[in-house]
């Protein structure tokens, strides 16, 4: 098995770090099996049958919960062993009760590591073949609309959720709808990459703008309504956005900017957090919110519109945000970050604006639903006609531009198709209450499918390389290969989604900032030591040669 990627200190650090976890996990599984065997024998002897069964279930449940979500730590008040020691010390000492209680977390870590190994094998070795991309418009559209039809037949759902604002079944821009929205866009986005469907470039730019719009809309709604600016909430959001991408960068020796959507969402999430978190106690005042919106626009104008400011601000972060495409080595390191973030520099603010006026629009829709039939039909028909007209002119005079020209207009016009879609998707109460749950399910794992596609669906073969090839598990049978690789790819993406949330619950406590800080410092110390040790092991032999 030949590798196209050199062994790096980061990769070696992961290997060294996972070895003790494997040992601890195997030992915990053995302890759990031994406990189960003893319990089974006791049950067969009919001694205290009911009490033992209850205790067994209770202990297994506790292994899932892990005391306040506070990382690897004791969950049972009856746990034996040095409970006064920190979780890290108990892990190093292989404390039996601790390992049994955290068996499922250890198992999740191992499963995640196995999936990272699969990433590496698929994209950095010659174990599997690769094939070239091929685009056929008829096949592309056939596959996409086939998925839509299957989704409509098998997963069409009518929702009756109540609005958190009015308590009525208005459901304007409800969660089911936005998840479905993300789902059908993500499918087209991924197929665009798989088939190299260059003619849909402008559409993909709009889809990415929609994702960033949702970042502004969703985060503003959460922080404005719940007023939760806690450290735990912030850490959970950063974990969700960056956990998988960080390990992908380490294991595969890629730059953070290769997965540009992750830093984009992280940046705009931080900007929403800062906008509402600063002077948060005054957020109920309309004048303060207006000033914050104005300040956001001013910041964007200064950073992205004034030449030289972006480079001046971001140059200290070149190590993190820099990217050198092997196919375009002549470009500046910050070019990719400047280009990608600049395309959607305003749309996150538009998302915040829509979120702020969401209750107002919902109240208008509530009143409209209670109006007379003729008036209701007239208003909805007018809205639909206006939206369709605006959408048509945008399509004819903006969307049809060549991609270089379109990119110049995109930051200022991407809100138009988004608004048109929102108007048409929410035109009637029944229509906005429908969703295709298969697409909504895909919409929940967009981050995982985005990152995974680079390595287990497509192939680059080299660090920081764009995925120009396809992973080929069934050579010479492109459609069978598409079916097999897609099935594996989607299944793994879903598992990564679940594992990310499982480990987030384990290591980020929701109500214990002290434990969160402890976990963070412990992780930094461990990672630093592992990297330093790995760096020495790799560097010394090279200097001796």
Curated annotation (Swiss-Prot):
GO terms for biological process: defense response to fungus; plant-type secondary cell wall biogenesis; polysaccharide metabolic process; xylan acetylation; xylan biosynthetic process; xylan metabolic process; xyloglucan metabolic process. It is found in: Golgi apparatus membrane; Endoplasmic reticulum membrane. Disruption phenotype: Decreased levels of acetylated cell wall polymers and lower amounts of acetic acid in single mutant. Increased tolerance toward the necrotrophic fungal pathogen Botrytis cinerea. Severe growth phenotypes (e.g. dwarf and abnormal flower organs) associated with reduction in the secondary wall thickening and the stem mechanical strength in the quadruple mutant rwa1 rwa2 rwa3 rwa4 and characterized by reduced xylan acetylation and altered ratio of non-methylated to methylated glucuronic acid side chains. Absence of interfascicular fibers and xylem cells differentiation. Keywords: Endoplasmic reticulum, Glycoprotein, Golgi apparatus, Membrane, Oxidoreductase, Phosphoprotein, Transferase, Transmembrane, Transmembrane helix. The modification Phosphoserine is found at residue 45. The chain crosses the membrane at residues 7-27, 108-128, 139-159, 184-204, 205-225, 238-257, 258-278, 293-313, 346-366, 378-398, 438-458, 470-490, 521-541. PANTHER family: N-ACETYLNEURAMINATE 9-O-ACETYLTRANSFERASE, PROTEIN REDUCED WALL ACETYLATION 2. This is Protein REDUCED WALL ACETYLATION 2. It comes from Arabidopsis thaliana (Mouse-ear cress). The gene is RWA2.
């Amino acid at each position: 098995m030949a590798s196209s990627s050199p062994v790096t200190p980061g990769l070696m650090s992961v290997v060294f770090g996972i070895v003790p976890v494997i040992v601890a996990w195997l030992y915990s599984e053995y302890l759990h099996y031994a406990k189960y065997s003893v319990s089974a024998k006791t049950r067969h002897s009919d001694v205290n049958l009911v009490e033992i069964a209850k205790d067994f279930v209770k202990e297994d449940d506790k292994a899932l919960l892990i005391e306040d979500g506070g990382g690897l730590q004791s969950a049972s008040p009856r746990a034996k062993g040095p409970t006064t020691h920190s979780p890290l010390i108990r892990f190093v000492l292989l404390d039996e009760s601790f390992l049994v209680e955290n068996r499922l977390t250890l198992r999740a870590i191992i499963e995640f590591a196995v999936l990272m190994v699969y990433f590496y094998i698929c994209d950095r070795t010659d174990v599997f073949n690769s094939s070239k991309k091929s685009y056929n418009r008829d096949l592309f559209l056939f596959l996409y609309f086939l998925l839509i039809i299957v989704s409509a037949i098998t997963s069409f759902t009518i929702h009756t959720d109540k609005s958190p604002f009015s308590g009525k079944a208005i459901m304007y821009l409800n969660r089911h709808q936005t998840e479905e929205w993300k789902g059908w866009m993500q499918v087209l986005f991924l197929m665009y990459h798989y088939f190299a469907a260059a003619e849909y470039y402008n559409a993909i730019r709009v889809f990415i703008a929609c994702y960033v719009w949702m970042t502004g809309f969703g985060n503003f709604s959460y922080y404005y309504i719940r007023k939760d600016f806690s450290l735990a909430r912030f850490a959970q959001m950063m974990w969700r956005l960056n956990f998988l991408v960080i390990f992908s960068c380490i294991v595969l020796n890629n730059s953070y900017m290769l997965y540009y959507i992750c830093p984009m969402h992280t940046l705009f999430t931080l900007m929403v957090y800062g906008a509402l978190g600063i002077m948060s106690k005054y957020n109920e005042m309309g004048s303060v919110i207006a000033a914050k919106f104005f300040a956001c626009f001013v910041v964007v104008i200064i950073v992205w519109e004034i030449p030289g400011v972006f480079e001046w601000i971001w140059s200290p972060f070149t190590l993190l945000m820099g990217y050198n495409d092997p196919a375009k080595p002549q470009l500046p390191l910050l070019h990719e970050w400047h280009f990608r973030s600049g395309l959607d520099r305003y749309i996150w603010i538009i998302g915040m604006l829509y979120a702020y006026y969401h209750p107002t629009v919902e109240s208008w829709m509530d009143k409209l639903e209670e109006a007379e039939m003729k008036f209701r039909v007239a208003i909805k028909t007018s809205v639909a006609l206006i939206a369709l007209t605006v959408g048509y002119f945008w399509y004819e005079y903006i969307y049809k531009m060549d991609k270089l020209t379109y990119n110049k207009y995109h930051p200022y016009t991407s809100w138009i198709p988004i608004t048109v879609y929102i108007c048409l998707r929410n035109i009637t109460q029944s229509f906005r209450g429908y969703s295709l749950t298969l697409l909504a399910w895909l919409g929940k794992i967009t981050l995982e499918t985005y990152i995974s596609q680079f390595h287990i669906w497509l192939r680059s073969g080299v660090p920081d390389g764009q995925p120009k090839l396809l992973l080929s598990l069934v050579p010479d049978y492109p459609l069978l290969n598409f079916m097999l690789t897609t099935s594996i790819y989607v299944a793994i993406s879903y598992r990564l989604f679940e594992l990310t949330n499982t480990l987030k619950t384990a290591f980020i406590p929701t109500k214990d900032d002290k434990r969160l800080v402890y976990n963070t410092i412990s992780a930094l110390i461990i990672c630093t030591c592992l990297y330093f040790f790995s760096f020495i092991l790799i560097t010394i032999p090279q200097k001796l040669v």
